[in-house]
């Protein structure tokens, strides 16, 4: 039986309740982690505070690798928010993959292109800060550097970078979901034959690999966002 995600029409717009639920849960988890890690700060961090400081240091390293800290320090909060949201969204549903798939018609929200393409709109501040920090004239001249005939290619690059930022996350996570579905079907088939333990072991190994891929994708998404920001605000480009 085919399971479809619940849809609701409101003011001419279609809302996917599965997406809305999982996005809300993801945001709540990130918010709870942030509050739990910062509500009683200590000079010697332990537990959740230690974890949160590690995340901040990690994102600080990402920013430092793409731009100088004096310029990029203002984007630290953005980077931490992105990496935590994408990571939690990728992990959400892994322990209960079958239940979530059956009940909600979906799993981790990065498997929905609508969500990942919305996340890629995080590139919009790039243009704002590019104009603010370089000036409108200097910012626009970047599209004709080093030679004017590159202008059409620079426009294509803008759309390509924006599109691939979201589709890369969607494609990698969605491919993992498809393979998990195939392995689950394989487990059901061999379970009937009395050999279900072997496919289930394969599923567990693939789940572990999915955790690795989800973590890497959160890093790559944050790294590329920082890189694109540096590309827009740096005077070297």
Curated annotation (Swiss-Prot):
PROSITE patterns: ATPASE_A
Membrane topology category: Multi-pass membrane protein
The keyword Cell inner membrane is assigned to this record: no
Keyword flag Transport: yes
GO biological process: proton motive force-driven plasma membrane ATP synthesis
Transmembrane segments: 17-37, 78-98, 178-198, 201-221
InterPro entries assigned: ATP_syn_F0_a_bact/chloroplast, ATP_synth_F0_asu, ATP_synth_F0_asu_AS, F0_ATP_A_sf
Main localization category: membrane
Any one GO molecular-function label of the UniProt entry: proton-transporting ATP synthase activity, rotational mechanism
SUPFAM superfamilies, sorted: F1F0 ATP synthase subunit A (SSF81336)
Pfam families for the chain: ATP-synt_A (PF00119)
Cell compartments where the protein resides: Cell membrane
Keywords associated with the record: ATP synthesis, Cell membrane, CF(0), Hydrogen ion transport, Ion transport, Membrane, Transmembrane, Transmembrane helix, Transport
GO CC annotation: plasma membrane; proton-transporting ATP synthase complex
Function in brief: Key component of the proton channel; it plays a direct role in the translocation of protons across the membrane.
Quaternary assembly: F-type ATPases have 2 components, CF(1) - the catalytic core - and CF(0) - the membrane proton channel. CF(1) has five subunits: alpha(3), beta(3), gamma(1), delta(1), epsilon(1). CF(0) has three main subunits: a(1), b(2) and c(9-12). The alpha and beta chains form an alternating ring which encloses part of the gamma chain. CF(1) is attached to CF(0) by a central stalk formed by the gamma and epsilon chains, while a peripheral stalk is formed by the delta and b chains.
Family indicated by similarity: Belongs to the ATPase A chain family.
PANTHER family: ATP SYNTHASE SUBUNIT A, CHLOROPLASTIC (PTHR42823:SF3)
Protein name: ATP synthase subunit a
Species annotation: Bacillus caldotenax
Name of encoding gene: atpB
């Amino acid at each position: 039986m085919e399971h479809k995600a619940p849809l609701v029409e409101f003011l001419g717009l279609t809302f996917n309740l599965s997406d809305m639920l999982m996005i809300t849960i993801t945001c709540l988890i990130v918010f709870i982690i942030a509050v739990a890690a910062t509500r009683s700060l200590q000079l010697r961090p332990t537990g959740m505070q230690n974890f949160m400081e590690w995340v901040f240091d990690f994102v600080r390293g990402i920013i430092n690798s793409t731009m100088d800290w004096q310029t990029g320090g203002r984007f630290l909060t953005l980077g931490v928010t992105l990496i935590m949201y994408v990571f939690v969204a990728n992990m959400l549903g892994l322990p209960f993959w079958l239940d979530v798939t059956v009940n909600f018609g979906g799993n981790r929200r990065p498997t929905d292109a609508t969500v990942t393409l919305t996340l890629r709109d995080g590139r919009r501040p790039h243009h704002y800060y590019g104009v603010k920090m370089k000036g409108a004239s200097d910012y626009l001249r970047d599209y004709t550097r080093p030679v004017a005939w590159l202008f059409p290619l620079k426009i294509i690059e803008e759309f390509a970078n924006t599109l691939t930022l979201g589709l890369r996350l969607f494609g990698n996570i969605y491919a993992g979901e498809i393979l998990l579905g195939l392995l689950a079907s394989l487990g059901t088939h061999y379970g009937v034959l009395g050999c279900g333990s072997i496919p289930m072991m394969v599923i567990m190994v693939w789940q572990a690999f999915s955790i690795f891929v989800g973590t890497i994708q959160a890093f790559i998404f944050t790294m590329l966002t920082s890189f694109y920001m540096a590309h827009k605000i740096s005077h070297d480009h």
